[in-house]
Design a protein with these regions (language model features):
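Short amphipathic alpha-helical face segments that pack within enzyme cores
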Residues: 105-113, 156-164, 211, 276-280, ...
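Hydrophobic alpha-helical hairpins/lids featuring a short glycine-rich hinge
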Residues: 83-140
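Short connector loops/turns at beta-strand edges and beta->alpha or beta->beta junctions
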Residues: 86, 106-108, 113, 135, ...
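Well-ordered alpha-helical scaffold segments within catalytic/enzyme domains
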Residues: 42, 111-118, 162-169, 215-219, ...
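Generic structural signal for well-ordered, non-membrane alpha-helices
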Residues: 6, 10, 34, 109, ...
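Terminal-appendage/accessory-domain detector
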Residues: 1-100, 200-210, 217-449
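Hydrophobic face of alpha-helices
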Residues: 25, 29, 33, 107, ...
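Glycine-rich, mobile lid/loop segments that gate access to catalytic sites or pores
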Residues: 116-213, 228, 233
Length: 449
């Protein structure tokens, strides 16, 4: 049996640009708008100016655009800056079933940076490259049968970057194998930074974008990497997953079905694990408009409860993953804005008062039971919501094109409006029609301030 690296390399090298179905193209266009929104919105997020200062101190000028700025860098630097910004707000796309991997911001950032460095590529070429890259990332992220604390966005997503960027550079199958092997030497990222509320979580996406491009460039120059990348004795899955993965998830339909369509777009700027509860909160608020609950009981799985941060969030990363904060914010105000998560201490006294009345506890019923939330009102009339069904933004419960466009506008406003309203409208048109562009330069030029 050949290593999965051979299968993925053959897929990446040989997939026809005409094999991207319209539903996949349409989803990728929305994913691109969504990713650009997150990048533009994150340009001033904590850690991003500091990263830019460090990188600019030793980076030469280049031809790849750093978005929402006047700066151009070599592709590896622009991709790192854009991908890090795109992950900073925890507002980028996600894979609900694959450990919460956020692949879009880093794959789009890397592919657009390389396209810039190549002088622009045709839209259909770009779409096929990103579709293959995201397909590879999704397949790898879905394969584990047990979680070992990896941040799959970076540790798994780097191989998606290789798939997309390698296609733009025209790698052969053999060169793809080497690129995957070199990427494996750099694949990393953990969730401890999430538990500790560290800014390094956002950096990990940028590292993967940068290192994926570097792996492809080295393979293209003739440098070799491990050939038994994924299934050798010390390969990715034996070492990183202790052999606990399902191979068929990766190989089934490979080359015939693109799984990028399974990626969800996030309607709320916080951890995806909170979104089902926020959907439920929105429904309850509509049903009881104007009523202030005396108490809110949230029942979640024991595993989630063990990881839950229940105290008042002191900073943005903690706020993005705080169940009591998100539920109180949505219930009290009917919104979940970037500004509120960015500065939790500045929220209204109503939110702070309601926060103290949110009680999170482990639910009964085993792993197959649904999370639920109970709103208890004065004088009775409790209202219970179960978080069953796909969360808003999932392909089976999609957000609208209008919602995604509004997200781009909101993110631009949050970042201090680095792009004019007219520029945003033009950017929306270019991104939604990316497959028909004569050159991706027509899109990235709109992101230059």
């Amino acid at each position: 049996m050949t290593d999965l690296a051979q299968d993925l390399a053959a897929h990446a090298a040989n997939f026809s640009a005409h094999g991207v179905e319209r539903s996949v193209r349409d989803h990728l266009a929305l994913d691109l708008v969504d990713g650009l929104a997150a990048i533009v919105g994150g340009t001033r997020a904590p850690g991003i100016p500091e990263l830019a200062q460090v990188l600019s101190a030793h980076a030469r000028p280049g031809t790849a655009q750093r978005f929402a700025s006047s700066e151009r860098y070599p592709a590896v630097v622009a991709a790192q800056l854009n991908a890090t910004a795109g992950h900073a707000l925890d507002y980028d796309d996600t894979l609900d079933e694959g450990g919460g991997m956020h692949a879009g911001a880093l794959v789009h950032s890397a592919a657009l940076a390389v396209a810039d460095e190549l002088g622009g590529v045709r839209g259909e070429t770009y779409v096929a490259a990103v579709a293959v890259g995201l397909d590879i990332a999704v397949r790898l992220a879905l394969a584990p049968t047990r979680d070992f604390g990896w941040h799959r966005t970076s540790a798994f997503g780097i191989f998606g970057v290789v798939g997309a960027v390698g296609r733009l550079y025209g790698l052969s199958q053999a060169e793809f194998v080497n690129a995957f092997g070199i990427a494996y030497s750099q694949a990393s990222g953990n969730r401890q930074c999430i538990a500790d509320g560290a800014l390094s979580k956002r950096l990990q996406a940028g590292f993967a974008a940068r290192d994926g491009i570097t792996a492809v460039q080295l393979a293209r120059a003739g440098v070799t990497g491990a050939s038994r990348v994924f299934e050798g004795a010390d390969g990715f899955f034996p070492l990183y997953q202790r052999g606990e993965y399902t191979r068929e998830v990766i190989t089934s339909g490979l080359g015939q079905q693109l799984l990028s369509r399974r990626i969800s777009l996030k309607p709320y700027p916080c951890g995806r694990n909170l979104h089902g509860l926020l959907d439920a909160t929105a429904r309850a608020r509509r049903a009881h408009e104007g009523r202030d609950p005396e108490r809110i009981d949230v029942f979640i799985s024991e595993k989630s409860f063990e990881r839950a941060a229940l105290g008042w969030p002191e900073h943005v990363v903690a706020a993005q993953f705080s169940i009591p904060f998100a539920v109180a914010l949505s219930t009290a105000t009917g919104r979940t804005s970037l500004a509120d998560f960015d500065a939790p201490d500045r929220v209204s006294t109503d939110v702070k008062a309601l926060f103290a009345r949110v009680h999170v506890q482990p639910r009964r019923g085993g792993p197959d039971a649904e999370d639920r939330i109970v709103f208890r009102y004065a004088g009775g009339g409790d209202h219970e919501e179960i978080t069953a069904g796909p969360r808003l933004g999932h392909p089976e419960n999609p957000v609208s094109r209008e919602h995604t466009a509004d997200k781009l506008r909101d993110c631009n406003a949050f970042a201090g409006a680095p792009l004019s309203d007219e520029r945003i409208d033009s950017l929306l048109s270019a991104a939604l029609g990316v497959a028909d562009l004569q050159s991706t330069s027509a899109l990235t030029s709109l992101l230059r301030r």
